[in-house]
């Protein structure tokens, strides 16, 4: 793959179209309270303009992730609304680590954080290499 193709893949991760999904229907304060109730021992991050990205990766990578309780998917968001651990200021972007759980109610859990997916978002698929290049 040449550089132009790789840059195109990275652009698609950030700005490409995907299948529309609805996020958490709750207001921000209610969503924050629900995250604390459902995941009391994890920091939470409320986000908007998000994508749930299923990663295209080698079978060995999929097997390894499954063996440690993870799935080949991440969240990318263009807008952090609130981060309970104060890692990201409001308005910044964020990319999660691998998925532990996800439900259609708008809660995506990674190993260390719960992401509350506010408003509409998209589901897309992208190569692992392109997603990991965004940091």
Spans of model-derived segments:
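N-terminal non-globular leader segments, chiefly Sec-dependent signal peptides
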Residues: 1-102, 120-135
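Amphipathic alpha-helical packing elements
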Residues: 105-119
């Amino acid at each position: 793959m040449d550089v132009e193709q790789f840059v195109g893949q990275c652009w698609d991760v950030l700005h490409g179209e995907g299948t529309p999904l609805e996020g958490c229907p709750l207001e921000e304060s209610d969503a924050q309270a629900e995250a604390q109730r459902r995941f009391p021992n994890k920091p939470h991050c409320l986000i908007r303009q998000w994508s749930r990205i299923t990663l295209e990766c080698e079978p060995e990578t999929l097997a390894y992730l499954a063996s440690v309780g993870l799935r080949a998917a991440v969240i990318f968001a263009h807008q952090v609304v609130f981060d309970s651990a104060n890692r990201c200021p409001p308005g910044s972007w964020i990319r999660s680590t691998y998925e532990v759980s996800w439900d259609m109610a708008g809660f995506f859990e990674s190993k260390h954080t719960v992401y509350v997916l506010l408003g509409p978002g998209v589901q897309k698929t992208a190569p692992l290499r392109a997603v990991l290049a965004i940091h």
